A protein has these predicted regions:
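Extracellular/periplasmic, surface-exposed regions of secreted and cell-surface proteins
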Residues: 1-135
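Conserved small-residue
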Residues: 93-190
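Short, hydrophobic/aromatic alpha-helical segments in well-folded domains
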Residues: 17, 32, 185-186, 191
Length: 191
């Protein structure tokens, strides 16, 4: 029906523009002190707390999927970063020999406070409340020992399993390992 080499031009709605996009904002508190004791011991302590808001994120909760276009990025994300740094340095001299010893302790923690993410069936699937770079996936609980172990375990939908394969946790206890069992796993890549 028709010429096989004919072209049909089509147009479709891409991502909507968002003229209201702004720079993200940050409110921060930094407190610190430095002290020298006995002209030999230097101590430094710093504490920080940073609240970032208006971070660009896809607004899954405010624009439904059925609208038929890619959702624009909006300033809706919120993240908190806090931590401290403590360093100590001891310096002294013995005759003509000068020396010092220095050490430090650092701690930093970030948390997604709001991400406008898609509604989830189970609370453990949300990224909000976790660290920014928190990995998500299936939680490994061991290895399949034999065929009886496979038969007595929840059904895996991602692949056919055999003895020696990784066994995953059924997070929602429905007897099936699938995308509804994805949760926060492991540690983040950043300290």
């Amino acid at each position: 029906f028709g010429d096989a080499n004919s072209n049909v031009e089509t147009y479709f709605e891409g991502t909507l523009a968002n003229p209201s996009v702004t720079w993200e904002k940050e409110r921060q508190l930094n407190v610190g002190f430095d002290a020298t004791l006995f002209r030999k011991l230097d101590i430094s302590f710093d504490f920080f707390n940073r609240d970032r808001r208006d971070i660009l994120a896809t607004p899954y909760r405010t624009i439904p999927d059925f609208v038929g276009f890619k959702k624009p990025e909006m300033n809706v994300g919120k993240v908190n970063n806090k931590g401290f740094e403590l360093t100590a340095r001891y310096a002294d001299r013995i005759n003509d020999f000068n020396y010092y010893v220095q050490g430090g302790v650092w701690y930093a923690h970030n948390e997604v406070k709001y991400n406008a993410e898609m509604l989830q069936q189970y609370s453990y699937m949300y990224r909000t409340g976790h660290r920014v770079d928190q990995p998500f996936g299936l939680q490994a609980i061991g290895f399949f020992k034999d065929q009886k172990d496979i038969d007595d375990s929840p059904q895996h939908t991602f692949m056919k399993v055999q003895p020696g394969d990784i066994k995953y946790k059924d997070m929602n206890n429905d007897g099936v390992i699938n995308e509804n069992d994805i949760c926060a796993i492991g540690y983040t890549n950043l300290p």
